[in-house]
């Protein structure tokens, strides 16, 4: 399901869609934990644009989204253009503090959309937590505390920081954390 707050942002910005690049915003809006990905959201659909290394993971983590392999399209901008043309998107917001100029220029040339800087609007949305996000944060804190209490006994002379880091990572997983770092 498309993030309701993103839909509200599209309406308030008076745009047809938004192009996200920051990994933390892509993850927040999509749930995707991989890297090197972009998210193009309209009011009706969300497209996770990624490369072949992540398409399988994306399909599992974001089953409600359309996964687009940008390498098959030739470029990120071309993949975005295919989507914007398909959905008749004319007004596209983008993360102006994250999209490099070259990609911005390519988006302008390829999509034919009028581009609007999103500023920190998505970051600000992400800062205000829902009850579900608060519950997840509480559980993460509980997991971290339990792992920390387990590692205290391992801290002694002769034990390296690398060993402690490896043990702490293991304890975190045993206590219920994701095994994948992000």
Indicate residue ranges for each PLM-predicted region.
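Terminal domain-start leader segments
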Residues: 1-47, 78, 82-88, 109, ...
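Flexible, acidic/His-enriched mid-domain "rim/lid" segments that flank
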Residues: 2-5, 75-180
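A short coil-to-beta-strand element that immediately follows conserved catalytic motifs
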Residues: 17, 179-182
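Conserved beta-strand termini and adjacent loop/short-helix elements that scaffold enzyme active sites
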Residues: 20-21, 68-72, 116-120
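Short, polar loop motifs at secondary-structure junctions
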Residues: 23, 50-56, 98-104
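Short, structured coil segments at secondary-structure junctions
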Residues: 42, 61-64, 110-112
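Compact, glycine/acidic-enriched structural inserts
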Residues: 51-78
């Amino acid at each position: 399901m498309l993030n309701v707050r993103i839909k509200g942002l599209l309406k308030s910005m008076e745009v047809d869609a938004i192009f996200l690049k920051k990994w933390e915003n892509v993850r927040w809006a999509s749930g995707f934990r991989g890297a090197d990905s972009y998210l193009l959201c309209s009011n009706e659909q969300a497209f996770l644009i990624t490369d072949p290394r992540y398409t399988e993971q994306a399909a599992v983590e974001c089953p409600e989204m359309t996964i687009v392999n940008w390498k098959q399209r030739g470029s990120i901008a071309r993949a975005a253009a295919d989507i914007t043309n398909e959905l008749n998107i004319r007004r596209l917001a983008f993360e102006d503090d994250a999209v490099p100029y070259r990609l911005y220029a390519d988006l302008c040339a390829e999509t034919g959309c009028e581009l609007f800087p999103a500023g920190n609007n998505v970051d600000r949305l992400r800062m205000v937590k829902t009850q579900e996000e608060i519950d997840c944060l509480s559980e993460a804190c509980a997991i971290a505390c339990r792992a920390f209490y387990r590692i205290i006994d391992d801290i002694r002379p002769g034990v390296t920081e690398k060993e402690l880091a490896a043990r702490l990572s293991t304890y975190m997983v045993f206590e219920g954390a994701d095994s994948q770092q992000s």
